[in-house]
Curated annotation (Swiss-Prot):
EC number of this enzyme: 2.4.1.-
Role according to the record: Galactosyltransferase involved in the biosynthesis of type II arabinogalactan. Possesses galactosyltransferase (GalT) activity in vitro, transferring galactose from UDP-galactose to a mixture of various oligosaccharides derived from arabinogalactan proteins. Forms a complex with GALT31A that can work cooperatively to enhance the activities of adding galactose residues at O6 positions to beta-1,6-galactan and beta-1,3-galactan.
Gene: GALT29A
Protein name (Swiss-Prot/TrEMBL): Beta-1,6-galactosyltransferase GALT29A
Transmembrane segments: 7-27
Species of the source: Arabidopsis thaliana (Mouse-ear cress)
Length: 398
């Protein structure tokens, strides 16, 4: 009889703890939902069943076909002398004709430089030396390290808090964050006031808010961009790239190694922090998105192998979107994450603030939408994240 009581007692005890946690969530959150409470219950560790991932799929998602080209490009830039004469001598010493990649790197360096390539001033030398040092440090960190998710508060939130005058810097997350995407579906919404009520509002790629305040809000605490945006801004005087104000911090991921030069040259003129995403965080995001993309492709296309996916997704050019990484950043630094402006309708524009209608083929937005659904409803189904990392409450607004 005692043996039959113990399982019953354990079940009742678990139910008591679960109910207690759900009540705590209801009290703490002004907008309580049972689904959100269950999501937090799962992330709290009370639900301990492990998700079994497909090992073959995990291994394929970990392969970066662009890695050889990346390393070659970094080496070419590192060996590049900032005078044209030395550069010509560098390429003329090769036993083979310069490859297209080598010629492109040469053009990129020349077009990216804010000082003439032939300039021999001490300032030019200092910038060039600093750029190559930054490039080497950035490239060395490009590796898979799942615990990077546990370090995002120190790497991103703390420098921003210092800039904002926070006296006591802690390891606590922001209470609430809104990540505002650029989807044309926002034109059918009135989320502006709701977005602005969050402690932190993250916007993408300098999207306009003027004239769209009722739909997307007006508040901005973090501007998240890809390095192509800063590269364009770098052509302006003082690298001006602040549509939300000069005091708004910028977090940027590097699309191409040469864009580290834009970062090096623009950072001194920025009053607010200009932060580069840690390359280990970039690698993790790349693996997660590739996993979801391949899994979706195999399920929908009934493909026989991974080669078909590579042909259908731009091969080595395949990449996560800016929005995806901004969401993952919020997941790492916020207690509650609200996601707005992610999704599409055939009747709406691709971006609410531009006339662009077509999607970029190097992104798999549908796969990323699956990720957002898992963040909201099944956070333990997301691969590559460390077990000790707590995924916050995530709500996706459509």
């Amino acid at each position: 009889m005692k043996r039959s009581v113990r399982p019953l007692f354990s079940a009742l005890l678990f139910a008591f703890f679960a109910a207690t946690l759900i009540c705590r969530v209801a009290i703490r959150r002004s907008s309580f939902s049972f689904a959100s409470a269950i999501a937090e219950l799962g992330s709290s560790g009370l639900m301990t069943e492990d998700i079994v991932f497909n090992e073959t799929l995990l291994e394929f998602a970990a392969i970066d076909p662009g890695e050889p080209n990346f390393k070659q490009e970094v080496d070419l830039i590192s060996d590049y002398d900032h005078t044209r004469r030395s550069h010509r001598r560098h390429f003329s010493s090769m036993s083979i004709r310069p490859s297209e990649q080598q010629r492109r790197v040469s053009r990129d360096i020349a077009s990216s430089s804010k000082f003439p390539v032939t300039l021999r001033s001490s300032q030019a030398y200092r910038y060039w030396s600093e750029f190559k040092r930054n490039l080497r440090l950035w490239a060395r960190r490009r590796a898979y390290e799942p615990n990077i998710m546990l370090d995002l508060i120190r790497l991103v939130k703390n420098p921003i808090d210092v800039h904002n005058g926070v006296v006591s810097i802690s390891s606590e997350r922001y209470l609430s964050c809104a990540v505002v995407g650029n989807s044309g579906t926002l034109l059918n919404s009135q989320y502006g006031d709701l977005i602005d009520k969050h402690e932190i509002v993250i916007r993408l790629n300098n999207a306009k808010t003027e004239r769209f305040e009722k739909k997307v809000g007006s508040k901005t605490n973090i501007s998240f961009i890809n390095s192509n945006i800063l590269h364009q801004c770098g052509r302006r005087e003082s690298c001006y790239c602040h549509p939300y104000g000069e005091t708004v911090p910028i977090v940027m991921y590097i699309c191409q190694p040469i864009h580290v030069l834009d970062y090096t040259l623009c950072k001194p003129s920025h009053r607010a922090p200009l932060l580069i995403t840690d390359p280990r965080f970039d690698v993790m995001c790349a693996r997660i998105v590739k996993y979801y993309s391949v899994k979706k492709f195999l399920e929908e296309k009934k493909a026989k192998g991974f080669v078909d996916w590579s042909k259908d997704h731009e091969g080595s050019l395949f990449h996560y979107s800016s929005g995806m990484q901004a969401v993952m950043l919020a997941v790492g630094i916020c207690e509650k994450v609200s996601v707005f402006g992610f999704g599409k309708l055939n009747s709406t524009k691709h971006h609410y603030h531009t006339n662009q209608k077509a999607e970029l083929k190097l992104h798999d937005y549908e796969a990323e939408y699956r990720l957002y659904r898992d963040l909201e409803n099944s956070p333990r189904a997301i691969p590559f994240l460390p077990k000790e990392f707590k995924i916050p409450l995530v709500q996706v607004y459509h």
